[in-house]
Amino acid sequence: MNRTEAREKATALVAQMTIEEAASQLLHSSPAIPRLGIPAYDWWSEALHGVARAGTATCYPQAIGLGATFDRELLQKIAGSIALEARAKYNAYSRLGDRTRYKGVTMWSPNINIFRDPRWGRGQETYGEDPVLTASLGCAFVEGLQTKRDGYLTTAACAKHFAVHSGPEALRHSFD
């Protein structure tokens, strides 16, 4: 199926949905729509440094450590390896009818937030404070996750936390 055929098929499928059915698909945990042959799917899968939340997998260093390498090619290879493991797990879990959280191929990765304040508790999930480095490594990670095999994406990347994730949450950077 080519891109045009896929778009036409998706458009026709959505046109058959009720408003309630379409709205139900907007959550990370999308329920099945049996009358249309749509299985349940949970869009929430993470791949910042591997896919071990759904069982055994290779665990790579946190993003801050990967950022310290300044190595775009390395990050692309790591992400490609993560994508292969994610696809293999997805295929295995799907055969069992298990499409719950962390078992999909839609990856909420990479984190392209800029690490602005060392007091923020999730800085290790970022590539650091340099926007140019973050852009370069983030693109490489997406390219690796979205490596095509047999004409299809291995996984689909969703770069996260671009806008204001490290603030300004109330009281995030203060103490009593």
Each PLM stretch: what is its role?
Residues M1-D176:
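Glycoside hydrolase catalytic-domain context in secreted enzymes
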